[in-house]
């Protein structure tokens, strides 16, 4: 039986790790031990932050909606506005609401009025 040398497979594995470590600083980009742990950690951060990104955007949309609502009516808060929209039967998600608040103030004002009417 022929002797199997592992050079080709290990070189391919190392090459894959170094490609992922491209742009890293110092030893982390050109020694396999440092690069492997750095790449593993970077993948953990990437996985975690894909989840965190969703939370951050939702928080941003809520802040924008709240600012838009309070600019139109000082007595109305974000939570009461959302409650009013629900009671009025208007189903618009927060992403669209924040976009409307920024780009179409007249339409947003109409939504605020409908929400206030539903609360009264």
From Swiss-Prot:
SUPFAM superfamilies: Ribosomal protein L20. The keyword RNA-binding applies. GO terms for cellular component: ribonucleoprotein complex; ribosome. One of its GO terms (biological process) is ribosomal large subunit assembly. Keywords: Ribonucleoprotein, Ribosomal protein, RNA-binding, rRNA-binding. Binds directly to 23S ribosomal RNA and is necessary for the in vitro assembly process of the 50S ribosomal subunit. It is not involved in the protein synthesizing functions of that subunit. Belongs to the bacterial ribosomal protein bL20 family. HAMAP family: Ribosomal_bL20 (MF_00382). This is Large ribosomal subunit protein bL20. The lineage of its organism: Bacteria, Pseudomonadati, Pseudomonadota, Alphaproteobacteria, Hyphomicrobiales. The gene is rplT.
């Amino acid at each position: 039986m022929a002797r199997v040398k592992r050079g080709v497979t290990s070189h391919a594995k190392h090459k894959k790790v170094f490609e992922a470590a491209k742009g890293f600083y110092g030893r982390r980009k050109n020694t396999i031990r440092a690069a492997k742990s750095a790449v593993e950690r970077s993948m953990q951060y990437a996985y975690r932050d894909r989840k965190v990104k969703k939370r951050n955007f939702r928080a941003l949309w809520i802040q924008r909606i709240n600012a838009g609502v309070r600019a139109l009516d000082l007595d109305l808060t974000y939570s009461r506005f959302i409650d009013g929209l629900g009671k009025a039967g208007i189903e618009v998600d927060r992403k669209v609401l924040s976009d409307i608040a920024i780009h179409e103030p007249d339409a947003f004002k109409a939504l605020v009025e409908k929400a206030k009417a539903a609360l009264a």
